[in-house]
Regions:
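PAPS-dependent sulfotransferases, especially Golgi type II membrane carbohydrate sulfotransferases
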Residues: 1-2, 121, 153-156, 184-242
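PAPS-dependent sulfotransferase catalytic core
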Residues: 1-67, 201, 205
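A structural signal for well-ordered alpha-helical scaffolds and beta->alpha junctions
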Residues: 11, 61, 89, 93, ...
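Pocket-edge structural micro-motifs
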Residues: 28, 83-84, 230
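PAPS-dependent sulfotransferase catalytic domain
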Residues: 79-193, 208-214
Length: 242
């Protein structure tokens, strides 16, 4: 099971809520997708000659397939929700379909682009970002927004039941019904969640990203008011992409 979509859309909050269920493991940003991709590039690239010469190509394929099992080897929950914004990219979905029998299911979080940009600008300002806090945020195929944006666009036009799209405001304002939709989509037995005592069981070290507070959540659900003014150029760009 995957958790993907745009950044600043409540993925940490959603993971914390789902993790209240002992049968669900949902942690922070996962390396599984990147590890599988890198191994695939090796098996069908730099290591191909050796694998074929020694009749070990099947071994290489097994290595790719077993990366999720190794990554989550200490997890006892029956369902793992792997969080990575790259799961909506076509090559990564093709990789899931190639190596696993079951049809992949991916939760895709969305939010108006202008709100995402405001959130990142506020985060940069809080971390004393040196330079223009709007700099590079909407550059073509850039991280962390535009690469994810392209993935979400692709998922929307190629959805054959693999993707469940979730709006940020629905997660905040219609939490119970949104969680119920997720359980139905994932074909999981229902669970009574506590939306007034939310704890992040798997906190990330935001120093690695250079953005302290990036994955902070509060024990109750509410939308933070941001006193952020964007430039006219940025507002226009957000509107043109929406």
């Amino acid at each position: 099971m995957g958790l993907s979509g745009l950044p600043r859309t409540g993925s940490t909050l959603l993971s914390a809520i789902l993790s209240q269920n002992p049968e669900i493991h949902a942690e922070g940003n996962s390396a599984v997708c990147q590890l599988m991709w890198d191994m695939q590039c090796s098996v069908y690239g730099t290591a191909t000659q050796q694998l074929i010469a020694s009749d070990r190509l099947d071994t290489g394929i097994e290595l790719i397939k077993n990366i999720p099992n190794i990554y989550y080897k200490d997890v006892t929950a029956s369902t793992v929700i792997d969080k990575c914004r790259s799961w909506t990219l076509p090559d990564n979905m093709a990789m899931l379909n190639k190596y696993f029998e079951h049809k992949p299911k991916v939760l895709v979080l969305e939010r108006p682009l202008i709100e995402i940009v405001r959130s990142f600008v506020a985060l940069r300002q809080a971390n004393n970002y040196k330079g223009d806090p709007e700099e590079g945020l909407l550059d073509t195929w850039s991280e962390p927004i535009m690469r994810s944006y392209e993935g979400v666009k692709w998922a929307k036009t190629n959805n054959n039941g693999e993707f469940l799209f979730i709006q940020y405001d629905d997660l905040l304002n219609n939490t119970k019904s949104t969680i119920n939709k997720i359980y139905e989509f994932c074909e999981l037995e229902s669970f009574e969640h506590d939306f007034n005592n939310i704890v992040n069981k798997h906190p990330e070290n935001d120093e690695v990203y250079g953005m302290l507070g990036q994955h902070d959540i509060r024990p109750t659900i509410n939308k933070r008011d941001l006193d952020v003014k964007l430039s006219k150029e940025m507002i226009a760009k957000c509107k043109s992409l929406s």
